[in-house]
From Swiss-Prot:
Myosin is a hexamer of 2 heavy chains and 4 light chains. GO terms for cellular component: cytosol; extracellular exosome; muscle myosin complex; myosin complex; myosin II complex; unconventional myosin complex. The gene is MYL6B. Residues 1-51 are annotated as: Disordered. SMART domains: EFh. This is Myosin light chain 6B. Residues 10-40 have a biased composition (Low complexity). GO terms for molecular function: calcium ion binding; cytoskeletal motor activity; structural constituent of muscle.
Amino acid sequence: MPPKKDVPVKKPAGPSISKPAAKPAAAGAPPAKTKAEPAVPQAPQKTQEPPVDLSKVVIEFNKDQLEEFKEAFELFDRVGDGKILYSQCGDVMRALGQNPTNAEVLKVLGNPKSDELKSRRVDFETFLPMLQAVAKNRGQGTYEDYLEGFRVFDKEGNGKVMGAELRHVLTTLGEKMTEEEVETVLAGHEDSNGCINYEAFLKHILSV
């Protein structure tokens, strides 16, 4: 009898081990998600503004300005062949009275790679449209530029600014406006609390 008790060997447990093998299929799904996740944050980093089409830029500088610009340009020419490095373009633009951001400089250069900035060179004739594009761009603030400026005064973060505060800014900062001009501009934009929805105000001003 004792040997018969040994007959029911607990080997059936072997097939139960094979059952977990079916689980890897379910476990395989999560890794697929983790692979997709890292790709998402990389996308925003690659977003760049399209380069400026320099062939369409019209040079508006006068003769005196062109002579002055060329003299300044030549000061940055370290080789003596009438060219400067891409990496120097931003410095030359700033020396000529412009104040472009690094992103704006890269945009007019055609969004070059970091190694190209240190190796590629440009002559004055090619640089001039870049300078003109930057000068024109800085003279024309975009909706986002102005919106960012208004947000500084939006202390409540509700999309509104006090009309009195805006009047003070318009009459004392930048290109100062007269009180009459300010009243004309703000007419109809203040609510019962003396506040102004600056997004609607901006859209109205920029559409005029």
